[in-house]
Amino acid sequence: MHQTEAFAAGEEAEELRPSVESDKKEERILARRLRLAARKEAQTKQRLGEDDLGKEDVKEETRKSQKEVEHRERRMAKLKSDGLELVTNIQVAADARESDRRTELEEGHRLRREKLENEAKSSQEKFEEINRKWTDAKMKQTPLDLRDALSSQQQLCEQIIADKNKLISELQQELKASDDRYVKDLKRQAKDIDLLVERMEEQISTLKKSYREDLHQIENSLDEERRTLLTKHKKKWEHERKDRNEKELKNMMQSLSVMEEYADLLQKLRVQTAEEYNIDKIRMDTEVQKLRMKVQQTKFNCHMNEEKLDYKYEVLKKKEEENAIIKSQLKRKIIRMQDVLNNLKSKLTKQEKQSKAGNQSLSNDYTRISQQYKDMQKKARHFAALDAERLEKLWLMCEDEAKALTHRALETDRVIHEQQLGLEWASPPLPFMERSGAVQQKTFRTATQAAADTLKGEPEGGLDEDTAAGLNKRTVKSILELLCDEMGFLVESKLLMLLSPLEKNEQSLIKLDAIFSAIGIESEKDVYKMAEFFMNYRQHESKYTKDETANGQGESAEELSNLIHTEDLLAALKDFTAQFCRQDVHASHKSSILGLDMRDDSEDAAYWESIANVMPESKLKLWDALDTALNKYHAVLTERTELLMETQNIQQQNSELRQLLHLYTTSKAQ
């Protein structure tokens, strides 16, 4: 009866949308929940890009399925509230009875305490009276008086015992009444529990039935909405496709019109160029006429200069006579200077002897330092080989670990696609799986090695070949020799003293090494870049054509000076170092001096990046979305498991309570 009334009230409340401004607490809570659910759904759609309509106005009317879900949620909330009220009514009544029972029990305790206190007082008074009479009885001497006193004392004791027995009987009656009342309470509680279980089972069956109906209605509304959305999106797609076709046709027509405009513009430019050529020709003819007039003026100036020279010749004759006098004076001065010269020659002889001794000492030092340098090169190569071997081992270990992780990630992706999503899985391209070991190292020749090979080349055949940069070796050799001759100030004076006993090629090689160290040239590529820069420098300054530069590459050093003049060499070198050479070249120059191979690690980052990015960003987003959905599903399953276990425990407790109650009532009845 109560359940039917609650269901009817719920049907009436379903027509009203809950509001946060409602007077009822349940409706306000439900309205907040619905608003939070709608907000979370909108955020999820915006993050995953599932629905472009998520960016529309917030006041947009909710979908039909959402309305159906909200309607069913309000109905179920009302049904749960009514069912909970029916179940808790029994508990409220039991609590009220228990409160009354405890009140009566406290009142009975109070009355019993008062009775016990009154009886204790009266018993104490009677006991004191008995003690006083014993004192009086001891003072009596006749047996008759003693018998009367003893009888009186006996009556008083019997009266005390009678009062005690009366109190005990009253307490026993109350105890029996409490036992009877306890049995009645147990029976009443058993009836309440049965009624409670019956109402709970009835409520559970009603909720199950309502849940099934709501689920069926929600599924129907979702199917209908899905069909509507499919139809809507199909129409939208057709409309977009038509618009795209129209835009492509429009763009094609615009391209044709632009091509026609460009053709007209090209014809106009041709006509304009022809007109400019005619204007330039007229201007050049005018300049030629001006130059001819200038030549005539120059001839006139030459004639005037001849007359001036004749005048100066007469003046010089007079000066010659004066110079004869001065010459005689200078002869006397020369004699004095010869004496000074002889003294200086003797000093020079002594200085040469000292210089030879110093050179011999420096030569010995150079031999010793050269041997130390070779030993250091040998050790450096040894350690470089060890480092390369360690790098290869570490590379292979990291590569194996990365490939294992890649296989694991691909297997996980395959399981997700095939088992969780039901899609066909295709393996992405894995070019790094087909290779093993470090990225191939590139060995660069140092600038000193390239200079040594160039300077030692034979002119018959080796110098006529082209380098890897497309330059002629003869030209490169000429540039290096020009550097040795003109850039000697970059070499230390002590080093120049050590180079005097060496051959010319060795001197040039050591000078070039010092010059390269000073300007920051490290590799063979830098040498060829410098040579090309020098060849183009004079061309850039004098606006020579590239054909003249190409014809001059195979000529001698004298012809090279026409391309880069010795006076321009220092300026060209400054420009080259400012544009191409780095400021901090100490570390790389040290490795070039030791003769170590320089490893190109430019492709290492791309190689490891390709392994790290084997999974595209789209798949990672798919994994995150799937992980979130599975976590929610797991949370729902966990909650259902806990509820089932709790229900089973409650059922087991109810059955145990029924058995205990049945045993207790049976034992009381017996």
From Swiss-Prot:
GO biological process, one term: cilium-dependent cell motility
Skewed-composition ranges (Low complexity): 1-10
Cellular component, GO, one term: motile cilium
Bias type Basic and acidic residues, positions: 15-26
Keywords: Cell projection, Cilium, Coiled coil, Cytoplasm, Cytoskeleton, Flagellum
Compartments (UniProt record): Cytoplasm, Cytoskeleton, Cilium axoneme; Cytoplasm, Cytoskeleton, Flagellum axoneme
Principal location class: cytoplasm
The keyword Cytoplasm is annotated on this UniProt entry: yes
Disordered: annotated segments: 1-26, 39-72
InterPro entries found in the cross-reference section: DRC1/2_N, DRC1/DRC2, DRC1_C
UniProt feature coiled coil, ranges: 55-261, 326-382
The family this protein is said to belong to: Belongs to the DRC1 family.
Complex formation: Component of the nexin-dynein regulatory complex (N-DRC).
Function: Component of the nexin-dynein regulatory complex (N-DRC) a key regulator of ciliary/flagellar motility which maintains the alignment and integrity of the distal axoneme and regulates microtubule sliding in motile axonemes. Plays a critical role in the assembly of N-DRC and also stabilizes the assembly of multiple inner dynein arms and radial spokes. Coassembles with CCDC65/DRC2 to form a central scaffold needed for assembly of the N-DRC and its attachment to the outer doublet microtubules.
Name of the protein described by the UniProt record: Dynein regulatory complex protein 1
Organism: Danio rerio (Zebrafish)
